[in-house]
């Protein structure tokens, strides 16, 4: 039981509170240490996000097509063209003999009696509008088939039974969803039905057993009489046919006639066909340096932003007189005062960090070590990228835009090899642990600049994860997390100790109060004795 200072006149609770404030000083140190570790963990993770952005920018110029972008120009109204990265700059010729078309069959005449048109949503037997005065009930229960052929020429056949209590739309839906690759519909303007392939191209029987591509079979009376669809009226689908000439390779055209679509690729150029030509028409292929230039500049800008931020973190002053605020200290400050304090307390958390210093040095070496290439460029300076002469910018890259554009125009493949070259597979196939120093050196010299930087980034990001973790790791799985857990244990132990110390103070003051009560009682008895 806790006894206040009734006998002694001492404010026991206030006295113990002041004593405990002194005892809690080490606990505040532990709490501040934990907060500092959490801030440092978060700062490392922010750095990893920064490095990931740079890695993404580097990845954007990894593909050959990202640096060797081609474009084609032509005055033709019959096609457009898109060359791939390997197509040589120059003039080519194309003749379009035939475009790919869909097979289709259309009613030979109107299917209604003329005064009133058929409704596709009403039941067939609720209408008396059929051409030639047909009695629709005569066709109830008839079964017909439709056969089409897939891309291999195999037949696909489906059967359909006429139910006059249902609508035309119901029949169309059954046919369209039967997996035949056709679409049937009614055109009210012309009062005709059309059935057509959903894809362009010639889809014929592999064995040549049928000249038609949408074949009607079974009892075709409904198709022939009511819908006016006759097999002989089919317009068969066709494949596209083009002739292509690369005058450097041959004056004889290459004929392509097996494309079922109007996208035809020949000579590394993909043509989108919209019509036929009367003869050969010319297209010119050239390098689009703008797209490649922008990707390189995006990487340079991201690289500069990254090293600027890293150098800022490494040089931030550390204010050791501004430890993290405890909750009690924060309550004593205004919101603005607390913000200013936190700014100084968080400053310099990564000052002179060895991992980040090593990364900056390694990336600079990655960029300036020559690359073994087969092209004309083996150094980044040869394509117009250099380090700023201002030492205060610490490795900031500067670009001679004219020189970079000229390099991309003259030899984009060589620029790609400089940036993205890979080491010989005979070297990279050797397990990392078994490589000699000479082999490691050769791999490095054959690896392009971007590959080197991405390797350095990956290594540092992995080191940061080992130290500061990420959202997928528990605190036991990274260094700072284990340090935080250790501080938590110390805090728990110290809090238990504080409880014991506070209880001891209360016990001591309680005994003092009890002794004072006894002394007061004895004094009162003596005083009463002398009075009497």
Swiss-Prot record:
InterPro entries (UniProt xref): FliD (IPR040026), FliD_C (IPR010809), FliD_N (IPR003481)
Coiled-coil positions are 507-528
Sorted alphabetically, which keywords does the UniProt record give? Bacterial flagellum, Coiled coil, Secreted
Q: What is its main location?
A: secreted
Q: Which cellular component appears as one GO term in the record?
A: bacterial-type flagellum filament cap
Localization in the cell: Secreted; Bacterial flagellum
Q: Which GO terms describe its biological process?
A: bacterial-type flagellum-dependent cell motility; cell adhesion
Pfam family of the protein (one): FliD_N
Q: How does it assemble?
A: Homopentamer.
What does the record give as the function of this protein?
Required for the morphogenesis and for the elongation of the flagellar filament by facilitating polymerization of the flagellin monomers at the tip of growing filament. Forms a capping structure, which prevents flagellin subunits (transported through the central channel of the flagellum) from leaking out without polymerization at the distal end.
Q: Please identify the protein, giving its name as recorded.
A: Flagellar hook-associated protein 2
Species, as recorded: Halalkalibacterium halodurans (strain ATCC BAA-125 / DSM 18197 / FERM 7344 / JCM 9153 / C-125)
Q: What is the lineage of its organism?
A: Bacteria, Bacillati, Bacillota, Bacilli, Bacillales
Gene from which the chain derives: fliD
């Amino acid at each position: 039981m806790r006894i206040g200072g009734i006998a002694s006149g001492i404010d026991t609770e206030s006295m113990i509170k002041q004593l405990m404030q002194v005892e809690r000083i080490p606990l505040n140190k532990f709490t501040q240490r934990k907060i500092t570790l959490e801030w440092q963990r978060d700062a490392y993770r922010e750095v990893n996000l920064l490095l990931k952005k740079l890695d993404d920018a580097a990845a954007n110029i990894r593909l050959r097509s990202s640096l060797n972008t081609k474009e084609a120009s032509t005055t033709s109204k019959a096609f457009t063209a898109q060359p791939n990265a390997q197509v040589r700059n120059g003039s080519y010729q194309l003749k379009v003999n035939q475009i790919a078309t869909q097979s289709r069959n259309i009613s030979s005449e109107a299917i209604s009696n003329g005064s009133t048109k058929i409704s596709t949503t009403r039941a067939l037997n609720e209408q008396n509008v059929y051409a030639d005065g047909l009695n629709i009930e005569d066709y109830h229960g008839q079964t017909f088939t439709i056969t089409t052929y897939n891309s291999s020429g195999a037949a696909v056949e489906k059967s359909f039974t006429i139910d006059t209590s249902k609508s035309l739309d119901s029949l169309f839906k059954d046919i369209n969803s039967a997996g035949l690759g056709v679409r049937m519909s009614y055109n009210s303007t012309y009062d005709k039905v059309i059935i057509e392939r959903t894809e362009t191209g010639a889809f014929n029987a592999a064995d040549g057993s049928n000249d038609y591509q949408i074949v009607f079979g079974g009892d075709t009376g409904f198709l022939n009489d009511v819908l006016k669809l006759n097999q002989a009226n089919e317009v068969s689908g066709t494949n596209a046919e083009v002739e292509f000439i690369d005058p450097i390779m041959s004056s004889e055209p290459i004929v392509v006639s097996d494309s079922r679509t109007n996208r035809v690729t020949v000579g590394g150029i993909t043509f989108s066909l919209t019509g036929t030509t009367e003869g050969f028409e010319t297209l010119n292929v050239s390098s689009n340096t703008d797209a490649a230039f922008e990707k390189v500049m995006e990487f340079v800008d991201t690289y500069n932003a990254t090293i600027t931020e890293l150098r800022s973190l490494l040089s931030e002053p550390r204010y050791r007189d501004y430890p993290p605020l405890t909750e009690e200290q924060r309550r004593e400050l205004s919101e603005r005062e607390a913000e200013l304090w936190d700014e100084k307390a968080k400053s310099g958390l990564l000052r002179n960090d060895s991992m980040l210093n090593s990364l900056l040095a390694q990336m600079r070496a990655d960029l300036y070590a020559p690359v073994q290439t087969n092209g004309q460029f083996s150094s980044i300076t040869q394509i117009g990228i250099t380090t700023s002469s201002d030492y205060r910018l610490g490795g900031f890259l500067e670009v001679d835009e004219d020189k970079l554009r000229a390099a991309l125009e003259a030899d984009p493949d060589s620029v790609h090899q400089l940036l993205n070259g890979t080491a010989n597979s005979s070297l990279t196939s050797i397990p990392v642990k078994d490589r000699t120093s000479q082999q490691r050196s050769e791999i490095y010299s054959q690896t392009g600049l971007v590959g080197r930087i991405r390797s350095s980034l990956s290594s540092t990001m992995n080191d940061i994860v080992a130290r500061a973790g990420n959202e997928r790791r528990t605190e036991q799985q990274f260094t700072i997390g284990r340090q935080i857990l250790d501080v938590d244990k110390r805090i728990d132990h110290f809090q238990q100790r504080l409880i014991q110390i506070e209880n001891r103070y209360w016990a001591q003051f309680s005994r003092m109060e009890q002794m004072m009560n006894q002394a007061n009682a004895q004094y009162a008895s003596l005083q009463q004795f002398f009075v009497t």
